[in-house]
Amino acid sequence: MSAAEAGGVFHRARGRTLDAFPAEKESEWKGPFYFILGADPQFGLMKAWSTGDCDNGGDEWEQEIRLTEQAVQAINKLNPKPKFFVLCGDLIHAMPGKPWRTEQTEDLKRVLRTVDRAIPLVLVSGNHDIGNAPTAETVDEFCRTWGDDYFSFWVGGVLFLVLNSQFYENPSKCPSLKQAQDQWLDEQLSIARQRHCQHAIIFQHIPLFLESIDEDDDYYFNLSKSTRKKLADKFIHAGVKVVFSGHYHRNAGGTYQNLDMVVSSAIGCQLGRDPHGLRVVVVTAEKIVHRYYSLDELSEKGIEDDLMDLIKKK
């Protein structure tokens, strides 16, 4: 079954937008809401990491299935329901053309089909989803499987932009696709400026930076200095408040001028000391408040009262 046939939860992005949120109904502020952010379920990485062969390993992913099922069950129990559930890339571990890619994809679809149908999915492309050096073919495969690789949508007067960050990391095999996203992004940021939206929020897989705009190039976990600065300045000029990313498999982040960079750890394999988890993000008229929960915490206790008070505030 393809994502399109799965229906319900798979409101796949098409035409650079998400039909789960019609713009004409969602362009005005209606009051506080929240969403759930996850990153890097990356079916197969835990086995590959444990064997020390991240390039060719990953022939088992039962642990990731259980963790993602736990994440979905925790989300489904939440009341009130989140506006959406966003996955910030690296949905699976097997790169394009590698063994087990089809099987990992089908298993993830099966788990995601159990998300409450009232909670749309927002899917972000990661480097493992489209390759470290994406091509027109790998991007097309992602789009056919999961929906557009970049798009925008409105929720209650807030503009959300989903970006394909691999175009900023290595566009050498698809320069025209990168150019198209650049042009589209400029148009979207112009809309954000002109419309004076309540907030503008960006989702992308690779962080601009892990702690500081001036940190050294990591050559893997952050974008290059010149790229990150150019993007961050663009975002700030348009009034973007926060960029959410995954990729690092640890919690991290920092602030540049008035732009927050939030790096959220993984549902799947942890590369640091954080627990497997999800981030609760509350959007109020004045601010964006977020907190990382372990899957166990969210499953057993739900969202804490101080955040619930913000969500219910009129």
From Swiss-Prot:
EC id: 3.1.3.16
Keyword terms of this UniProt record: Cytoplasm, Hydrolase, Metal-binding, Phosphoprotein
Annotated positions of the Phosphoserine modification: S2, S294
Enzyme class: hydrolase
UniProt: a divalent metal cation 1 binding residues: D53, D90
Main localization of the protein described in the UniProt heading: cytoplasm
Any GO MF annotation of the entry: metal ion binding
Region: Catalytic, residue numbers: 47-250
rRNA-binding as UniProt keyword: no
Family: Belongs to the metallophosphoesterase superfamily. CPPED1 family.
Protein name: Serine/threonine-protein phosphatase CPPED1
Native source organism of the sequence: Pongo abelii
Lineage: Eukaryota, Metazoa, Chordata, Craniata, Vertebrata
Recorded name of the encoding gene: CPPED1
